[in-house]
Amino acid sequence: MVQGGSSISIRKKNFCIIAHIDHGKSTLADRFIQKAKIISDRDFKSQMLDSMDIERERGITIKSQAVTITYKSNDGDFYELNFVDTPGHVDFSYEVSRAISSCEGALLLIDASQGIQAQTVSNFYMAFEHDLEIIPVINKIDLPNANVDFVKKQIKNDLGLNEEIAISISAKNGIGIDDLLEAICKYVPSPRGSIKDPLRALIFDSHYDSYRGVVVHFRIFEGQIKMGDKIRLMHTNSEHLIEEIGIFKISLERKDTLEAGDVGYFIAGIKNISDVKIGDTVTLCDFPALSPLEGFKEVKPVVFSSVYPVDANQYDDLLKAMDRLKLNDASLTFEKDSSSALGHGFKCGFLGLLHLEVIQERIEREFNLNVILTSPSVRYKIIPKKGESYFIETPEQFPGNEAIESVLEPYIKANIIVPTEFLGNIMSVCLLKRGVQTNLIYLDTKRVELIYKMPLSEILFDFYDKIKSVSRGYASFDYELLDYEYTDLVRLDILVNGDRVDALSQLVFKDSARTKAIGICKKLKDEIARQQFRIAIQGAIGSNVIARETISPVRKDVTAKCYGGDITRKRKLLEKQKEGKKRMKMVGNVEIPQSAFLAVLKSNDN
């Protein structure tokens, strides 16, 4: 937040709504929109700011969405409220951090029936570190098991906030919304900065319009911008002419001028997607700022998977889709990749498994492309016997065991908050996932916080679902990355008739390699069609075969035309068939159907 200068307007307030997943952020945003009457009742629908079908179907927010409303307070003043509805899932915490960077205040939403959860704490610290004014909001007070007094104690004891200013609401029923709006006007600081200073505005998001090019979302900290201005993006040093500026009111609303404190958008005929970088600073060409604003901390992907088009002819379409998604999702990384089995595609980096699933669904829905994703993995560190250490993300990059001194894998610090009655269940799950308990804190008589150190690879697939299952849905989970630690990792290769299938190779923990290999071999046996020769499916670590399945050959009745007669005639035909099968086995390539690859990938998810 820019300090110094005078308040631009006492009637402008910028804030975001942050909370643990499913605590009611989008529902509260809906009530604000209805209160401001910026959309007719006929056009209104729930989750108004969740524009993607996948968000509505899953009931989650994936993209932060900004909107501007006007509110008349009890003192008669009109306030322009710019607010951002943010995601709650840990995979999209980068979206939350960008929203926080463009605000002066935050509404910390807490479910009255569940209390403070892991992501509540994580988002609180993020807002606290950015020096935001935090207003605690207790939601869902209409629920039969709501306990407002207990949650107020948590706000005081766990977060150190003043529980007296906490606002109790029911976003679903519209209870307490007026009190909350009054608190926003009272407690959230007005933005600071002078409109006389050179323009400095922070790009916090963007999306692509097929007709007008890139639509840039930005927050102005100093100066002003108007139609026809020539701007410079300070990071890429590219210059553009402003064609349209405006604010977000569900749809885009044009304005002639925007000034310090405003959150809005601009369109400048930018067709080259690479010209726009999230975190870049916008300034004017004829009155430039001397230095850019502090951008966003570059986020690093933690989960890696390769994406391939089912139809190889759609590679160029997939490239365009990835470029468009990257514009709208700065946390997505990708580079070109190829596989002998799956063709040309892209090696992608994601923030988590939900992020991966969302990107896959967006590719298929928004761009009408069918794609295959390889088994997700993390980034491992290789220390060779000779030379410097390096990182790998795919099994193909894994060198032979004879060349490796040691392997390191990324570890996380897992924070799990759970009712005390489910403590034993959670500890059992963490133990199975190679977790090491580092702390156990009783938050009160009913809740305990468990802190574990565990490998990132162990939480990729089913960890979140398992802790939810064994706690009847009450456990909450958040994590942060730690450093790398030594591990006993091996590359599991799958061989079909002695030939390694690159697309099926996996990096696995040595103790679980045999179980994994047996499962894959059985899956392939069910999926690969029988041939006229025997097919051997093997799981191997280096030259050691640890699992095997055999597909028996189809037997063609070559003696069918022999009606009676000499038995030696039949024997000759059978011997000839036997020799033919030997030759066929030597030169025959086994065709592995796409369904087999999908079956193996699906088994990894389970």
UniProtKB/Swiss-Prot annotation:
Pfam family, one: EFG_III
Enzyme superclass (EC): hydrolase
Xref: InterPro entries: EF-4 (IPR006297), EFG_II (IPR041095), EFG_III/V (IPR035647), EFG_V-like (IPR000640), EFTu-like_2 (IPR004161), G_TR_CS (IPR031157), LepA_C_sf (IPR038363), LepA_CTD (IPR013842)
Membrane topology summary: Peripheral membrane protein
GO biological process: one example: positive regulation of translation
The tr-type G domain, residue ranges: 10-192
EC number(s) recorded for this UniProt protein: 3.6.5.n1
Highest taxon listed in the record's lineage: Bacteria
Predominant cellular place of this UniProt entry's protein: membrane
Binding residues for GTP: D22, H23, G24, K25, S26, T27, N139, K140, I141, D142
GO cellular component: plasma membrane
Keyword entries, A-Z: Cell inner membrane, Cell membrane, GTP-binding, Hydrolase, Membrane, Nucleotide-binding, Protein biosynthesis
Localization per Swiss-Prot or TrEMBL: Cell inner membrane
Reaction(s) this enzyme catalyzes, per UniProt: GTP + H2O = GDP + phosphate + H(+)
GO molecular function terms noted in the UniProt entry: GTP binding; GTPase activity; ribosome binding; translation elongation factor activity
Function: Required for accurate and efficient protein synthesis under certain stress conditions. May act as a fidelity factor of the translation reaction, by catalyzing a one-codon backward translocation of tRNAs on improperly translocated ribosomes. Back-translocation proceeds from a post-translocation (POST) complex to a pre-translocation (PRE) complex, thus giving elongation factor G a second chance to translocate the tRNAs correctly. Binds to ribosomes in a GTP-dependent manner.
Family from the record: Belongs to the TRAFAC class translation factor GTPase superfamily. Classic translation factor GTPase family. LepA subfamily.
PANTHER family the UniProt entry points to: TRANSLATION FACTOR GUF1 HOMOLOG, CHLOROPLASTIC, TRANSLATION FACTOR GUF1-RELATED
Entry-linked HAMAP family: LepA (MF_00071)
Name of this chain's protein: Elongation factor 4
Native organism: Borreliella burgdorferi (strain ATCC 35210 / DSM 4680 / CIP 102532 / B31) (Borrelia burgdorferi)
Gene expressing this chain: lepA
